[in-house]
């Protein structure tokens, strides 16, 4: 520990010179002015807050303060003219048009045609006319009997004239019915696929039904059935062929699609 009686200019000794914080300072300790000022300021703020709070908030037994002026009691409803009017009322911004039904492209009903009847071969029938009946002989008289007695002389034999035998009438050749020629099948490049069926019978049925739905557009068109193996299952892809243009095939597809059938143009 340092010697308190050593001065600043005292020559050093063998004793170590060190600072001891526990060594008392000479004279009286100064007052903590900063702490005192902080306490005074804090007390002042607390007093100010308490006074402001008590002045702005009513007591527990005080009635609430009235805000604004009192409203008189309304005995009758206000007139419509006194109510504010919306300047945009009555304006029609959008047109309330009734929705029009969309056009449905359905095939017209098919007109049944008369089945062609083959003409039957008729053989001409020969008719023979009966000979004319001989007139009845008049009653004999005396003069006629005398004339007959005088005429009972052998008359000369008549000369027999050979008459030509009538030629047999040749029978008219029987007319045979000619089968109607099948309508020519169009061979256009475009086609419409109408489905992939599980059997040839269903494929033929689907083709016939598609042609029936649009007979005018499918007139003279062909049928094409392709065998396709898909995932171990054999399908029969059916198409209506022979359309001259892609537009004609598209029109046929739209006509049968309007009846609920699926198709696409190839």
Swiss-Prot record:
Entry GO terms, CC = plasma membrane
Could you list which ranges are Periplasmic topological domains?
Answer: 54-266
The protein's location, in the record's own words, is:
Cell inner membrane
Q: How does it sit in the membrane?
A: Single-pass membrane protein
Domain SPOR: where? 184-266
For this protein, the parts annotated as crossing the membrane are: 33-53
Q: Which PROSITE patterns match?
A: SPOR
Keywords, alphabetical? Cell cycle, Cell division, Cell inner membrane, Cell membrane, Membrane, Transmembrane, Transmembrane helix
One annotated GO molecular function: peptidoglycan binding
Q: From the UniProt entry, list the residue stretches annotated as the region Disordered.
A: 1-21, 71-136
Q: Where is the composition biased (Low complexity)?
A: 112-136
Q: Which domain of life is it from?
A: Bacteria
The cross-references to Pfam families, in alphabetical order and at most eight, read: SPOR
> Which BP terms does GO give this entry?
cell division
Q: Which residue ranges are assigned to the Cytoplasmic compartment in the record's topology?
A: 1-32
Statement: the UniProt record of this protein carries the keyword Transmembrane: yes
Reproduce the free-text note on domains from the UniProt record. Answer: The SPOR domain is dispensable for cell division, but it consolidates the position of FtsN at the cell division site and the cell pole.
Give the record's subunit note.
Interacts with FtsI, FtsW and the cell division inhibitor SidA.
Task: Report the protein's function.
Answer: Essential cell division protein.
What is the name attached to this protein's record? Cell division protein FtsN
Look up and give the organism this protein is from.
Caulobacter vibrioides (strain NA1000 / CB15N)
């Amino acid at each position: 520990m340092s010697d308190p009686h050593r001065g600043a200019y005292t020559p050093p000794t063998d004793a170590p010179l060190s600072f001891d914080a526990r060594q008392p300072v000479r004279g009286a300790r100064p007052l903590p002015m900063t702490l005192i000022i902080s306490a005074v300021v804090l007390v002042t703020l607390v007093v100010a807050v308490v006074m402001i709070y008590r002045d702005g908030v009513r007591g527990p037994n005080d009635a609430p303060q009235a805000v604004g002026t009192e409203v008189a009691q309304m005995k009758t409803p206000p007139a419509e003219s006194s109510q504010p009017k919306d300047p945009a009322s009555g304006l029609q911004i959008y047109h309330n048009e009734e929705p029009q039904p969309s056009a449905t492209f359905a095939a017209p009903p098919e007109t049944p045609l008369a089945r062609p009847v083959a003409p039957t071969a008729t053989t001409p029938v020969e008719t023979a006319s009966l000979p004319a009946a001989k007139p009845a002989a008049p009653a004999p008289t005396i003069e006629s009997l005398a004339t007959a007695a005088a005429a009972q002389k052998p008359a000369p034999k008549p000369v027999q004239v050979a008459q030509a035998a009538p030629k047999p009438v040749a029978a008219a050749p029987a007319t045979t019915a000619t089968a109607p020629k099948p309508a020519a099948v169009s061979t256009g490049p475009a086609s419409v696929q109408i489905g992939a069926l599980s059997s040839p019978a269903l494929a033929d049925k689907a083709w016939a039904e598609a042609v029936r739905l649009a007979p005018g557009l499918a007139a003279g068109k062909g049928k094409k059935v392709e065998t396709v193996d898909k995932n171990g299952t054999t399908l029969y892809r059916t198409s209506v062929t022979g359309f001259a243009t892609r537009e004609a095939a598209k029109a046929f597809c739209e006509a049968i699609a309007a009846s609920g059938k699926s198709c696409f143009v190839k």
